[in-house]
Amino acid sequence: PGAPSSTEPEFTVVTIYNIQYTTAENGASPLVGEQVQTTGIVTGVDRLGTNSAFTIQSGSGAWTGIYCWWAADDGVVVGDEVTVRGTVTEYAASTGDANLSMTELVAGSIVSVNSSGNTLPQPVTLDVEDVGQEMYEGVLVTTTGRVVEAAVCDSDEPNYNYCEWRISNNLDASMMADTVSVNDRFAVTTPALGTIATVTGPLNQWSGSSNSGPSW
């Protein structure tokens, strides 16, 4: 008889660029549905109860970052370099357009924390109207705009206390294409309307909108 077959799933080792780079009009990854292993530096962390979500990036510039969503808190922190495994998927909010989704790694695990305290990649400086480009999904970016929508805060979960507000390069907040939704990731900032704000953070995108978690 031959060697016993393994029940361990096979993971293809790829770069974040391999996962993210796409020419598809809807921005979908060419690796959707595949189980992959990749490495990057943690640039942002969300913790939702027993769930963990974080963004990792390898290098600077376009196509170098990706959002990871786990069903367990792995305890990673910003500055850790991690090797992760997961399934490539496209996420769109239930009320959004399925053709305007965000590429994620889901149902995954940490293979190793390779090092800690690493310098984060250099943020890409963008005008507000350029933030929504597919190539910057998951990438650390910096942008400056005027606060055109007051902060809405959510403190239902004691371990997920945050506010969201919106900046624009246009005084008309109804022009959504020229605005960025800012999630302050636990900092609970409530800037006054009309304030000029510079925000830096990993960029999330879904339903065609942008959400940047700034560092202050």
Residue ranges, per PLM feature:
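Extracellular fibronectin type III
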Residues: 2-10
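OB-fold nucleic-acid-binding modules
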Residues: 11-216
